[in-house]
Every structure is written in structure tokens, then in C-alpha cells.
Amino acid sequence: MSGIALQGIRCHACRNAAFRSFAAISGLSSSIRRPQSSISYPGSKLYQRNVRTTGRRQFSTLGSVKSQVDSDLPTKTETKEDASAESSHIPWYLQDESHKPSSHPLKQQELPPLPENPPPILENLLQYISVDAGLDDLALLDLRGLDPPPALGANLIMIIGTARSVKHLNVSGDRLCRWLRSNYQLRPIADGLLGRNELKIKLRRRARKAKATGDASSLNSRDDGITTGWICVNVGDVENGPLKTKNSQDRNFIGFGGTEDKVRIVVQMLVEEKRSELQLEALWGSLLNPEAGEMNPAPRDDIWGNLSSETTSSRKGVDSIASTFSQRFPGRRHIHTQARPDTLEPLSHEILGNIVQESRPALPSKIVSTSMASPSVSSLLEQLSQLPEEEARRELGLGPGDRDSTLFLRLFYEAVSKSDTETVLIDKLSFARAAVLLKHPAYSKTDLYRAFKSMAASGCDISEELAMDTVRTLLSFQGPENAANERVPEQDIDLALRVLEHMSLRGIKIFNGEVFFLLHKASAFQSHVLPANDAPGATNTPADPDSISKVPVEELDHITTVHNRLSKLMASANVDFDYKDYPELLKMYFEHGNYSNFWRLWHRIPLMQIPRTKELYLLMFRLHAKLGHQRQAVDCLSSWVPMMAREQPPVALDEELTRDIMACMLVADPAIDQKTDDGTVSQFTRLWKQCLRDLKSFKAANSQ
């Protein structure tokens, strides 16, 4: 086959058929079957009846519509077709296809039946959507009886239709909005709709790019703003039909405003691929008929990902959770008005038990029951917190699946079994937090996040304090204190951000100083670090070189970029840190080489009407002495030692502050002690002599 012929065969099915025909001529057997393009929608038969109209359609579907296979076809015909397709060697262009039945195009144009008490506009709207707009496979969902109402509004009627292409989708949405405005004086809102000129401009730009690259298929993988595939037209509030029930005034009403019987109509217009992906009919159909969903349970995607309690490694669990969120909800927020039920099943324990040594010395348990009755969960956790860390980790057993290896676990799960569902979820979340804070090797932050999402998915009321405790635990360091080059993993930060996002959806204010402080701290190293290319020299000699580790410059630049972005976000949100966090922030900025942010925060403290106390000056002098940078030590001493007397209130010198100033002077001028003895005059000799006199007076005062 020539290259021109291969270029002409763009369709995947045509390429397979051509390959099958040439393979048949050459005597090879091919098992490639022609792909079927019929897609079934589980919720599209909620309202169906016979064809109500066969009017002339402005968007003809006779040439481009995908045929669907009728359910009443005999199985013998399908078996015979498959057998003949596999055994026959007749080329595809010579095969007789007259015996293959095809569904009538009007099957996709059936109008759904009207619900009870339909609004007067509904029948004309369905007629226009099907005949004039040209949407196929219409489905009508009557959501007026849902309690609580959907997020789109109460008394909702939803119409779902399929467009043939993205261009057809935008043209149909635009014409529908114009038709509603001109005929019914409504003001529809179309989310995802591109205007006529905007659509033409984007299509023209895409055509130019495809022509320049010479390959139009390379642009299909990018989101250019045209391939959304979904337009939601909110028709607005319309008059409702006559009610056959008792008068609406007899119904109890709680809230503000009056009781209105208007109906809100929403038209969901999607391309075929987007409709099969979202499955809106199945989602709303399960809410309309929950009994059917219980009788025929099917796997579904949850907003919190997979709720199974399988215990795996921390990295694997985090990756699976992140992939579920990124694929199903890329960069969007979704509002749910009904809680999803969650089954409380014991966590399985298979892999994590190998992390902990199975052979342990049999030590007596320090957890005791203080009364004949079972102790409460709060008292058990309180006793656990009072134990040494090693003994407390021993009381937690082998992992999440262990329930009876220690006395604490037996008492804990016995107390949990007597509580209601909400209390059980809160207790399990507190237990997971305690295990992570104790740095038990078999309990990971992924287990803590699973406990939180189980509580959130069950619809329990999560307090702000409980959610913030979870965020603090997720953003905590797991290694020993001042461990070299330790940072909070990005997976743990991602889990904390998901908890914060859930808090925001629940109306909790997450833009506060504590949240930004935790994010600043989690994105940095736990200990003092220096760039790897910053070798100690005459002007940069750390006081304790072993306590300062070297890291690549790129990592420090990345941390600085993250801190700068967080600072800009705080400025735009008009949020500031809490004063108690200032010393740790100053230390973190300085130890990561972010001196600009250090001095910016240092100068901002008095502007906020907050005095710079002795503790802040002690921190500044100690950081410069530990860094060992001569030039920075000189600038610090010359600028801020005189400034101490000008503070409001003034910072008085004492023995501790004097020693830190002298340590900083030894960095600025290592030979200052010898220069003072020799009588040589230098920049800091006078200050050095004053510090010596002050130390003598302090010692004399202490001796008395």
C-alpha cells in the first residue's frame, strides 16, 4: 500500500478493516474485530415513551449518528456473524452487509415523557431541543422531590442531551439561549458556552497551528479551551404546573422569604464522550430511586476516592489517592448536598506487620483500667500520652489491623464498639493522630488521612479544632529532632491541602496565620542548611560546621520560591502571622539563606505595633554567630546594637545578651581579643571593652 493510501485512512476502524482484508488475501488469520460504537446510558430510560414527533431537524443526524444495537436481536444472528467474520477470508469491501440490521435514526430522537404537573414551557422546550437544536438521547430527570434540594436549586427539572460535536454543542447552546430570550423573555445562564466570535477565533487559531505543525492530531491532546464538551444552560425559574396535591400553604415552611412554587429548569448539553464519562443519569437516578441502587450495587467513584480499608505502604497509598482526585476532579470544586454512607469495616493488616519486629520482649503493660467498667477512649488516650514514647509505641501493637495484641488495643476497641457511628469515627481519627505523633513505624499519615476522609464521607460534623489537629499532624516532621536534610514529603503536604480544601467547602475559614505558618514550616528543612557550593572560607566559617548540612542550591531556591508565593498569597488575602510564630519564622528564613525575607519580617515587627524584645535580639545574634559570615556579622553589630536602646521599651543588656554579642563580634573580627590587649583601635574594640566591664559587674552582682 502506498503512502498516500495510508494517509487517507485516518479512521481507526478503517485501518483495522484494511489490515484485515490484506491479511486475508495473504492467507493470514486475523482476530481483529470491527469496533462497536454503541454506548448505553443507564439513566437515559428514566422517562421514555414512543416517538412523539418526527419534525424536520435543522441538524441532520442521518449521516453522522452512531448506530445502537437493538436489545431484541436474536443471539443466533450475532453468533453467526462473529463466526463468519473470523472464518471468512472475503475482503471487507466485498462482504455483503445487507443482512446487518441497523437501528432507525429516530430511535435517538425520542422525546422523554413529561413528568407529573409539568411546567407549561417544558413541552415546547423539549421540542426545540430535539428538533431545532438537534440533541439526541434526551433524558428528563424530575428532581423536584429531592430533600435536601440539589445545589442548582430547589424544584429542579434537569434535561440531558447529547451533541454530535464540539461545534454543534456551542451552536446549539447559543441558539437555545437566544430562543429563550426572544420567545419567553428569560435570562438563561450558559456555563461553558463560547460565543460565536470567540468560537470562530479559537477554531481559526487552532487551524493555523495545525497547518504550521503539519499534524492536526498533535493538538488534540491539549486543552485549548474548545474541547470542554459540556455546557450547562440554566433556564431559570419558570411557572410550575397545576398541583394535584393539597394547597402549598398547608406545608410547613422554615426559613426566610416566601414559599414559591416556581420550577428551575437546567439543560445539560454534552458530547457523547463527556456524557459517557460523567454518567449524570446514573448519579441523579440513584438519588431518585435509592432502593434500586441498594438492590443492584455497582462500583462508583466517590469524592474521597476509594473508601476501602486496605493497608499498604505510605507512598503507594498516597499515589492511588492522588490519581483518583486528579483524574476525576482536575482542578475543580464540587458541591454535594447529601452525605454518602460509609461502612465501618476493620482495617486489614497484611504488609505493615513486617515493618515491626515480630519477636519482642514480653514487657508488662502500663495501661490499666481504673474501674470495673471499661474506660473511655479519652482516658485511654490520656494514659497513652503520659507513657514514654517507646512504651507508648509498644502499646499500639503491630499496625492498623492489630486489635488485641496489647491491653490498650483491647480496651480501646471495646470502648469504641459501644459508641455511636459519629463517636466511633472521631475516636478512630484521634487514635490515628496519636499513632502518627508517636512516630510508630506501622502507622502512616495515609492511615490518618483515610480516617479523616471516612469521617467526612459519612456526613459527620467535623469541628474546626479537629480538622486543624489533623492538618498539624499531617504537616509534622517524622524524623528525630534536628535531623539532617529532613523535610515533610510532598505527598503529606498534598494530603494536608486536601483536608484544608474540605474545610473550606464546609465553610471553615482556612486563610489564617496558623495555616500559612504550617505550610511555611512544612516546605522547609527541619535543621540549618547551607548551599552545597558555599564552602567555608575566611569570611564564612560556621561556629559548628557539623551541625550545618549541605544541600543543592536548587532545593534552597525552590524553598525560597514557595515561601515567596505563600507571602504574596498572604498579602492578597490580608493575613498575617501570629506574633508567637515570629521567632521560629525568623530562624527558618535565616537558616535557609532567605535573608531578604528575614530582614523584611524583622523590619515589619515594629510597624505592627509589636516591640522587638530581648528574645528576638538573642535569636538574631545567635544566628549570625552560628552562621559565621563575617560581613553579615559586621552589619548586624553596627546596625542593631545601638538600636537596642531605642526600642520601645528599650532592651537592656544582661549577661546572656552580652555573651551572644561577644560571640557575634568574634565572627566579625576574630582577633578582637588580641587587639584589645595590644591597644589596637578597631571598629568594635570599644564595644568589646564595654562588654567585658558589663560581664564583670554581672558576676559581682551574682556573687553578692
Curated annotation (Swiss-Prot):
Record's compositionally biased regions (Polar residues): 57-72
Gene Ontology cellular component list: mitochondrial inner membrane
Protein name listed in UniProt: ATPase synthesis protein 25, mitochondrial
Range annotated as the organelle transit peptide: 1-59
Role: Probable mitochondrial mRNA stabilization factor.
Superkingdom field: Eukaryota
Regions of compositional bias (Basic and acidic residues) in chain numbering: 73-83
Region (Disordered): 57-118
Gene of this entry: ATP25
